[in-house]
């Protein structure tokens, strides 16, 4: 360095501290929030390590984490925090998020008496489900549908490409097949991560019990709950914590469950299995197509 040379300060790249969020409550009302991460942490009562897995600038595998007052979802383009009263979705420019936001607004409204927004008056189970479970159901249906559609899209492209390569072996046709196989390999990994999350949750009743946010809120006034046990709701690892599924449970029942019923997860388990099997079928389908590509 020359003696008279001035030192030029180097701008450090720091983690993003303020994100844009979309809040959707039980009435379907949407609100855009541009707030500091500490505001979000205080609002939903989660640790910094939990919020970190939603950082769009960092890579974290798919995760579904149950916490004391919230459920943290990192499902590809769907990055959300669900509480018993609202869902906070990280705003992004990903066009795949648009239909998911619309579905959240439609399905989370307490006035929506039928599944999927149909107001025929015959199906009222959605109104009786806890808010957090309706939100979880929307998120998991959205990601599973997205991955299934992507699988079909690649599968439809793969077979014609293989036929072209069989008829005429050219570098162009070979490159096309290689690109398709690469895309299928990435998709397989994405599908498997979701499948693994659901499977791990199914294997642990305590993890599934963590998902009843409304149940825990209802029991918060109990001396047994207020005695300091709430610390245990924060698992040590952000990736091993409670996993969540597409879940529905009657709100009235959840609000009146006693402490000795806290591990009653039969309804959650049945709903979780439905998503697990659907996702496993998708996993097998994309695997078959990948093997065909060689």
Swiss-Prot record:
For this chain, the family text in UniProt reads: Belongs to the CorA metal ion transporter (MIT) (TC 1.A.35.5) family.
Q: Which CDD domains match?
A: Mrs2_Mfm1p-like (cd12823)
* Coiled coil, from the record: 179-216
Q: Name one GO molecular function term.
A: magnesium ion transmembrane transporter activity
InterPro entries named among the record's database cross-references:
MRS2-like (IPR039204)
- Record field: transmembrane: none
Query: This chain belongs to which protein, by name?
Result: Putative inactive magnesium transporter MRS2-8
List keywords of the entry alphabetically.
Coiled coil
User: In which organism is this protein found?
Assistant: Arabidopsis thaliana
Gene coding for it: MRS2-8
* Keyword presence, Cell inner membrane: no
Keyword Iron-sulfur included in the entry's annotation: no
